[in-house]
Amino acid sequence: MSKTIAINAGSSSLKWQLYQMPEEEVLAQGIIERIGLKDSISTVKYDGKKEEQILDIHDHTEAVKILLNDLIHFGIIAAYDEITGVGHRVVAGGELFKESVVVNDKVLEHIEELSVLAPLHNPGAAAGIRAFRDILPDITSVCVFDTSFHTSMAKHTYLYPIPQKYYTDYKVRKYGAHGTSHKYVAQEAAKMLGRPLEELKLITAHIGNGVSITANYHGKSVDTSMGFTPLAGPMMGTRSGDIDPAIIPYLIEQDPELKDAADVVNMLNKKSGLSGVSGISSDMRDIEAGLQEDNPDAVLAYNIFIDRIKKCIGQYFAVLNGADALVFTAGMGENAPLMRQDVIGGLTWFGMDIDPEKNVFGYRGDISTPESKVKVLVISTDEELCIARDVERLKNTK
């Protein structure tokens, strides 16, 4: 038996989950937020308890020290050497990393170089990896890449219709993201349907603050909505999703607050989507509250959101030439029944129909009617478990 930590590090946060392996038992979980500020928050959940501390955490190394000390302080582990592996979620692995890998200096260097593809995510992941290697240098560290699952896409799918030199010289192509989530829920969907994954055609919709939709053919990703970066695809919480690229130079010319392309991309990443259109929030719960109040901006944001998701799902029905099931997962996918109802309401032509009583908050499983030709499933994603499994698989190959 061994203990493995799954880590999801952001620029100012560190989310973690401790597993007993190979039993896959969750021993504890938590998050450290606002790293770099004087009022950082560390939350630990274990044995039905919740401990929260306000601390001054300067960087990721200090955050890791606090996490490990808390594990001992709360009696979750007796000593550091009980931890035999740590797995790190990394958003962008480019073309280099087609599967999870054991970390070494070269791997870490490549992750930092690939920050250009995920500037909101890779730097934080690299900081988390460095922190664990500094404090626990003798345990196996594994990187699990969001992009790895999508390396099965065909060249005609991942290339953009621009001169090929931009791919050959600069590796401009579709990479996708959320691959660990899409892989996990596809496997769970096959179990739920009682059929081999290798026989299924699935559309998996990861709808959280970030949104990505994937066409899964016989267990492999054949297309996905996120692209060169996680900015592409349907409308998201704070991200615009797909827009006409000619808008970028136009806005630089017209708006004095947007001085260059970086300013526009920052606006598209952090100030757009549900938040930008509604002027209220990136949280669907707040948008739905606005719908109840007949707030016109909330209504508009919601309608754009539903429209873009329906179009993307419809597109992947064409890619797969039909589908056996549509899977909803992640924060909104799992917990926004109104959104699911309105998305499916625009896709009934494909043979989908949901049971209104099953499509309720908190329900997990098959929410379609017996007559529905395409099954509609709600499955809780578990990226952390996927990470822990890969650590267990790779820790003896160091």
UniProtKB/Swiss-Prot annotation:
Single GO MF annotation: acetate kinase activity
Site (Transition state stabilizer) residue list: 178, 239
Gene3D superfamilies: 3.30.420.40
Involved pathway(s): Metabolic intermediate biosynthesis; acetyl-CoA biosynthesis; acetyl-CoA from acetate: step 1/2
Chief place where the protein resides: cytoplasm
GO biological process: acetate metabolic process; acetyl-CoA biosynthetic process
Catalytic activity: acetate + ATP = acetyl phosphate + ADP
Record text on cofactor binding: Mg(2+). Can also accept Mn(2+).
Residues reported in the UniProt entry to bind substrate: 89
Self-association state and partner proteins as the record states: Homodimer.
The protein's role, per its UniProt record: Catalyzes the formation of acetyl phosphate from acetate and ATP. Can also catalyze the reverse reaction.
Protein name according to UniProt: Acetate kinase
Gene name, Swiss-Prot/TrEMBL: ackA
